[in-house]
Amino acid sequence: MKTLFLLALLALVASTTFAQYSEVGGWYNEVGGGGGSQQCPQERPKLSSCKDYVMERCFTMKDFPVTWPTKWWKGGCEHEVREKCCKQLSQIAPQCRCDSIRRVIQGRLGGFLGIWRGEVFKQLQRAQSLPSKCNMGADCKFPSGYYW
């Protein structure tokens, strides 16, 4: 019974933390690297290749069926996925790029109670470095504490 109570309490704390995070719209604009939410469209941008790049997924038609993650660490398609990401990112206004990247990866990062913390940190760093990897300016800056 105590275990059930503790699990319920833990779930409540986790959902409250997430609700507080969701209520703070535009929180990272003050940190820098992102531009204001008022200037950027609120719909989710088409950055599927960037999401694949950040999550280290290898999706290319020549490798069909999907060959991730084995080809990824061999360097098989990382370059192709990054190039597609850069092309998609170039279609977004410079002041909106970091906000768009953050919105695309926002629901993808994490793990229950920080179980995947090391992996999340690596993916977060990868996401933040996208603009510089694409020669489109400085890295984004996201407050990492909100993801775990």
UniProtKB/Swiss-Prot annotation:
GO MF, one example = nutrient reservoir activity
Q: Name one Pfam family in it.
A: Tryp_alpha_amyl
Q: Would the keyword Chaperone be found if you checked this record's keyword annotation?
A: no
Alphabetically ordered keywords of this record:
Antibiotic, Antimicrobial, Disulfide bond, Membrane, Plant defense, Secreted, Signal, Toxin
Report the PTM annotation: Five disulfide bonds are present.
Any Gene Ontology CC annotation: membrane
GO BP annotations of the record are:
defense response to bacterium
Chief place of localization: membrane
Compartments it resides in: Membrane; Secreted, Extracellular space
Regarding tissue, the record states: Endosperm and aleurone layer of developing kernels. In the aleurone layer, mainly localized to starch granules and the surface of the plasma membrane, forming a uniform layer, also abundant in the intercellular space. In the endosperm, mainly localized to starch granules and the plasma membrane, but less abundant in the intercellular space. Not found in roots or coleoptiles.
Name this polypeptide is given: Puroindoline-B
Organism annotation: Triticum aestivum (Wheat)
